[in-house]
UniProtKB/Swiss-Prot annotation:
Coiled-coil boundaries: none
Phylogenetic placement of the source organism: Bacteria, Pseudomonadati, Pseudomonadota, Gammaproteobacteria, Enterobacterales
Family (UniProt): Belongs to the universal ribosomal protein uL1 family.
Source organism per UniProt: Erwinia tasmaniensis (strain DSM 17950 / CFBP 7177 / CIP 109463 / NCPPB 4357 / Et1/99)
Name of the protein this chain belongs to: Large ribosomal subunit protein uL1
Disulfide bond sites: none
Pfam families: Ribosomal_L1
Subunit structure of this chain's protein: Part of the 50S ribosomal subunit.
Any Gene Ontology CC annotation: cytosolic large ribosomal subunit
GO biological process: regulation of translation; translation
Gene that this polypeptide is encoded by: rplA
Chain's role: Binds directly to 23S rRNA. The L1 stalk is quite mobile in the ribosome, and is involved in E site tRNA release.
Gene Ontology molecular function: any one: tRNA binding
Highest taxon above the source species: Bacteria
Alphabetical list of PANTHER family matching this protein: 54S RIBOSOMAL PROTEIN L1, MITOCHONDRIAL (PTHR36427), LARGE RIBOSOMAL SUBUNIT PROTEIN UL1M (PTHR36427:SF3)
Entry keywords, A to Z: Repressor, Ribonucleoprotein, Ribosomal protein, RNA-binding, rRNA-binding, Translation regulation, tRNA-binding
Length: 234
């Protein structure tokens, strides 16, 4: 059996894996256990009541968190003409067409989000094998293929998170940083859960949001009692 590190022993002793914590208690525990030398992210795992094997029950989308994620996001936009100018004005770091595609093919990928206008997809389509595996391929379902690229850039900069269930029907994303106020983390979590409820597939039956767990980048998961969250989100 592998020897537990001091940090792992502390987490094991502090976190009751059988308990669902009130959101305020859960966040306080995460803050107490966040001892890394950097500001850790607060991540969420949401177990959904779906059959992930069925394509018509998969959940995918994006939402802007009210208090952002605490991350500085670099945005690349494929657009031309007025759309390109609008993207630059909205704060996009990289804007182009074939020239931007050439940079990416060379491995120059200093960005976190890729947005494209519909007419630019003829260029972006050539980059599927590069962008796809990294989760960067623009997609209309998450608002990254859009005629309004300026709005998409602003959303990305404002703290938009994209979500997609994995093969086990679990959504993994981030809701902020461990140094956020508890209320801000709570409101971000509630906002995400509201968005997920709106995205519930009609084919999904029974309880949709089955379990919510929070963790920090280097920490253990803490299950959250949904009763302590906004009723419209639970």
């Amino acid at each position: 059996m592998a020897k537990l590190t001091k940090r792992m022993r502390v987490i094991r002793d502090k976190v009751d894996s059988t308990k669902q914590y009130d959101i305020n208690e859960a966040v306080a525990l995460l803050k107490e256990l966040a001892t890394a030398k950097f500001v850790e992210s607060v991540d969420v795992a949401v177990n959904l009541g779906i059959d992930a094997r069925k394509s018509d029950q998969n959940v995918r989308g994006a939402t802007v968190l009210p208090h952002g994620t605490g991350r500085s996001v670099r945005v690349a936009v494929f657009a031309q003409g007025a759309n390109a100018e609008a993207a630059k004005a909205a704060g996009a770091e990289l804007v182009g067409m074939e020239d931007l595609a050439d940079q990416i093919k060379k491995g120059e990928m200093n960005f976190d989000v890729v947005i494209a206008s519909p007419d630019a997809m003829r260029v972006v389509g050539q980059l599927g094998q590069v962008l796809g595996p990294r989760g960067l391929m623009p997609n209309p379902k998450v608002g990254t293929v859009t005629p309004n690229v300026a709005e998409a850039v602003k959303n990305a900069k404002a703290g938009q998170v994209r979500y997609r269930n994995d093969k086990n029907g679990i959504i993994h994303t981030t809701i902020g940083k461990v140094d956020f106020d508890t209320d801000k983390l709570k409101e971000n979590l509630e906002s995400l859960l509201v968005a997920l409820k709106k995205a519930k597939p009609s084919q999904a039956k029974g309880v949709f949001i089955k379990k919510v767990s929070l963790s920090t980048t280097m920490g253990a998961g803490v299950a959250v009692d949904q009763a302590g969250l906004n009723a419209s989100a639970a």
